Amino acid sequence: MATIYRDKDADLRVLKDKTIAIIGYGNQGHAQGANLKDSGLDVIAADLKDSPAWKRAEKDGLRVMTVPEASKEADFIQILLPDELQPRIYREQIAPYLEEGNILGFSHGFNIHFNQIIPPEYVDVVMVAPKGPGDLVRRQFLEGKGVPCLVAVKQDYSKSAKRIALAYAKGIGGTRAGVLETTFAEETETDLFGEQVDLCGGVTAMIKAAFETMVQAGYQPEIAYFEACHELKLITDLIHEGGLMKMWNSVSNTAEYGGLTRGDRIINEQSREAMWEILEEIQSGKFAREWILESQAGLPVKKALEQQESEHLIEKVGAELRAMMPWLGEKK
């Protein structure tokens, strides 16, 4: 079982004499930067000059500068750029300015684990990864709460890397909820596996297959959409709130019996073998190499598949039905 750290296990004073640079003031960057600032720490933000992100950081009261300027000034450099942009920006705008004893931080381990970023030996390399989107990280912090985080140390030059990472996690509110210790390898591989097998890849493939089956059987596409896609949120919300048993206890007896007796026919031995194959592709670096080449080529496969997805009947039907439900577009 994972080791979990709380507020009492972290000391913000570890970071009091350090300048923290948030590289990339996007979804996570704005939340982490604003939370660290509100925790009394010295924070600077770096993004494209005069971009919306730059202006947002200024509005949040942070000093804003270019990536090279921030890298020169900071002691702790938290890289929160998209995975595919990190290696080039690191090589060109961060690495030349690293000094002995600096800390390189990440919220996802992809580029470190797959050697797209290879830091010098004289810096600490840590990860603090909130398990929630930036808006939630910020909102929970302002309410005096926090979002659980993962913490990992890849390189401990200072012999204080874990203390530093835990202090950072406390600064963004993570220790209020709990911080789970992991490794760069475990975070990266499980994150990719979850995205591909169920959260993004598996669930969308299942939705489309169920929808297509019903339409091919002669049912109206609108009715098929409700059953295959729209009602999924009702189920996932119940699981999210209270686990599998809250969901089973909340649906009808008919739904529970049907699901329990038929589910394994969908996720069968062949499906599980495919999951193992995908996991092995992740662990071996095969997927990483594929994604790196795809990014370098300008994302042709991704763009083609996105176009194909956008033309699926379920998208047309879904758009028409969602127009009948204006509350779906209302901000909470």
Swiss-Prot record:
Binding site for Mg(2+) 1: 191, 195
Keyword Hydrolase: no
Cofactor(s) needed: Mg(2+)
Binding site for substrate: 252
Reaction(s) the record says it catalyses: (2R)-2,3-dihydroxy-3-methylbutanoate + NADP(+) = (2S)-2-acetolactate + NADPH + H(+); (2R,3R)-2,3-dihydroxy-3-methylpentanoate + NADP(+) = (S)-2-ethyl-2-hydroxy-3-oxobutanoate + NADPH + H(+)
Pathway: Amino-acid biosynthesis; L-isoleucine biosynthesis; L-isoleucine from 2-oxobutanoate: step 2/4; Amino-acid biosynthesis; L-valine biosynthesis; L-valine from pyruvate: step 2/4
GO molecular function: ketol-acid reductoisomerase activity; magnesium ion binding; NADP binding
Domain KARI C-terminal knotted, residue spans: 183-328
Signal peptide boundaries: none
Cofactor binding, per record: Binds 2 magnesium ions per subunit.
Domain KARI N-terminal Rossmann: 1-182
Stored InterPro entries: 6-PGluconate_DH-like_C_sf, KARI, KARI_C, KARI_N, KARI_prok, NAD(P)-bd_dom_sf
Protein name per Swiss-Prot or TrEMBL: Ketol-acid reductoisomerase (NADP(+))
GN (gene name): ilvC
